[in-house]
Design a protein with these regions (language model features):
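NTP/phosphate- and nucleic-acid-binding module
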Residues: 1-221
């Protein structure tokens, strides 16, 4: 989401005049930013007048966009440490003030934005960099072989969500699409005959067959 996230001038609340928010373009977001054409300036609507004056930017050069906040920075300077009489000694033994700041990231907010931005009509489409698992392994009446593959993959350091429930293939496929793990491996009775598993990326429509012995190398980079 980095390419669609702005460092934004925003209200500092009770702490400072301004803060820096990290705002991601998201139609489900609750904030409105005003952004210039080359995306070098982004101002939260709540401080639009004060911030444009501070930055020397004309409001007419900014356009609104709906966003969701995923993180923030409050810079306190030395105000807080001065009140607490907190200092440090430098290399020359002189007392120096300590600069304080608060750096926050909203983990649940980030997840919500990912859900909004990386999904389709079937469900989630987790980006590989943040997916909770690399592989969704489905057993369709071939539990013994599927369990063997699960153990082989996990021993190789590959994160696997294993579904060995007694459900129909259609139900398992639908739930797999809903969860959106980057890659799905299906092991069924046909797999036992061919010695190959069915492998399908969540972002692609077609599946391919991969030999059991080649599955580990498929996920090693």
């Amino acid at each position: 989401i980095g390419d669609e996230t702005y460092v934004t001038f925003a209200s500092g609340g009770a702490f400072t005049k301004f803060s820096h928010e990290f705002q991601t373009i998201c139609t489900a977001g609750e904030d409105v930013l005003y952004v210039n054409a080359d995306r070098t300036v982004a101002v939260n609507e709540e401080v639009l007048d004060d911030a444009t004056q501070e930055l020397g930017v004309a409001k007419k050069t900014l356009s609104p966009v709906t966003t969701a906040e995923v993180g923030n920075i409050f810079k306190f300077g030395t105000e807080k440490s001065d009140k607490m009489h907190v200092v440090y000694k430098d290399a020359e033994g002189k007392q120096q003030p300590i600069y304080l700041a608060s750096y926050g990231i909203g983990i649940t907010r980030v997840m919500g934005v990912i859900v909004e931005k990386f999904s389709d009509e079937k469900g989630l489409v987790w980006p590989e960099a943040v997916a909770p698992f690399q592989v969704h392994l489905l057993s369709l009446g071939a539990d013994e072989k599927a369990t063997e593959i699960y153990e082989t993959l996990t021993k190789a350091g590959i994160e696997v969500l294993y579904d060995d429930r007694d459900l129909s293939a259609g139900a398992k496929f639908a739930e797999s699409d809903l969860l959106g793990i980057p890659c799905r491996i299906v092991v069924g009775k046909r797999s036992l005959e061919s010695g190959k598993a069915e492998v399908k990326k969540r972002t692609e429509g077609d599946a391919t067959e991969v030999a059991f012995d080649d599955l580990v190398s498929l996920f090693r980079k």
